[in-house]
Amino acid sequence: AKYPSGGGDVLMGSIITRNDALARTIKLSHMRLGTGVGANDVETLLRSLPTLEMRYTSQDKSAREIASWCESQPVFAQVLHPALPKSPGHIHWQKLCVGEQYPKGRAAGIFSVVVDAQFSTTQVDAFCDALRIFKIGYSWAGPMSLVVPYQKQNIRTLPAPHLKLGTVVRFCIGFEDVADLQADIQQAIHATLV
């Protein structure tokens, strides 16, 4: 419920199954763990729903523009955004997310860049720290733009060729001006990766 809540600060969801045995297991787990959604979280979500379309569309548009711009930056070996034709999974994304209602598809405000392998993780961390508008953070869908570096090999097993590309940095685009965010990335590149 990150996007529906409007602030990226509500964690909630649902599990739906046609399997009765699995439904009973899930219900028992829910009862035993005592998990549930608080009234304040529900209120936040209900209050934010009317602006969901506007927020999602804005963040999607900004993320596409910045991701496209990042493709022209030589320090990035790859840009991972499903709407970009060069991005892995683009064809699959088109099948799922492009249709009559949304001819250009929907892709949210999240994308990643793979910083060229010539740069160390220390340099990539310095790049993220040098950003002035982007804040370090793991969330998404909120009004502020966030960035977080991560090393894929420490998170999951991936094919060796993919690991050779470099360190991944995830950007979550908020509501700041696109030109300001691009300028922020550019100044951080010049300060740390050149």
Identify the role of each PLM range.
Residues 118-122, 130, 145-194:
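PLP-dependent enzyme catalytic core of the Aspartate aminotransferase-like
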